[in-house]
Amino acid sequence: MKLRDALESLLEDWRDDISPRWSAVLSGVEPDFAAVDDSLELDPGEVIFPGRRGRAPAGGRPDSCIFRALDSIDPDDVRVVVMGQDPYTHVAQATGRSFEQGDLTDWLGKPRVSPSLQRIIQAVALARTGDRRFTDGAGAWQRLVADLRTGALTIEPSMTLWDGWQAQGVLFVNAIFTFNRFDPRYQFGGHQPLWRPIVRRLLVHLAGRAGRPVAFVAWGGKALDALNGAGVEAAARAAGTWDKTVTLVRGPHPNAPPPGQPPFLHGRDPLGEVNQAVARVGGAPVRW
């Protein structure tokens, strides 16, 4: 089966999976099926994930959903947008929210916490305690896990943590909502162009709201490219919101900074920087 046909079938009546408020934001825009490379084929039994609401593919977390990022958060309440690239490449890990790893029930090592997520959780520990033992030097992650084991440090499980942030208005959204195989042809010739109109409308809407402070977070060049490609700054400038109620937070990717740039946690407080940016445009800090 062609990838394009499979995506059209998967996304039939896709608005059923989002709230009326988000549906209104996305009024008049559709996934761009015509932009999906017609030469891309799915192998027999190959799965596109995450799935539709209530229809998680085998091995996926039951609540995982293509539109999970939009659950339990009203468009007017978004105050931070954490931009990711695409879903995790394993069905058990992809939830529909950027950076969230779906196969984890704790942070103690099984399954293995992805390197990017390790550093985000280290940033959470720093934001909560101010203790750089959890971020600096060899063995910082091991020190964090050791304190979790003894109860000296408490960090909620992945789903609870992301649910709590989402309830505070933090939108963890990817530039690409679906995935089927680790192959750039499928990623950039199939899934990315499919979702481009949806992502552009969503981000431009958030950038253009009057009186609604929001910080867009770009950790890494690809996240920044996604925001720039959607025209976030241009939309905010046109609406008169740029540097007034809309701002951008840039930083290295949690996993691999570009050559010559410092790592994600090097001398930085990434989540504190987000709260400072939100405060500059009149928003309330996030309880990380």
Model-derived features: where do they sit?
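A polyanion-binding, active-site-adjacent surface
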Residues: 2-215, 221-228, 234, 256-259, ...
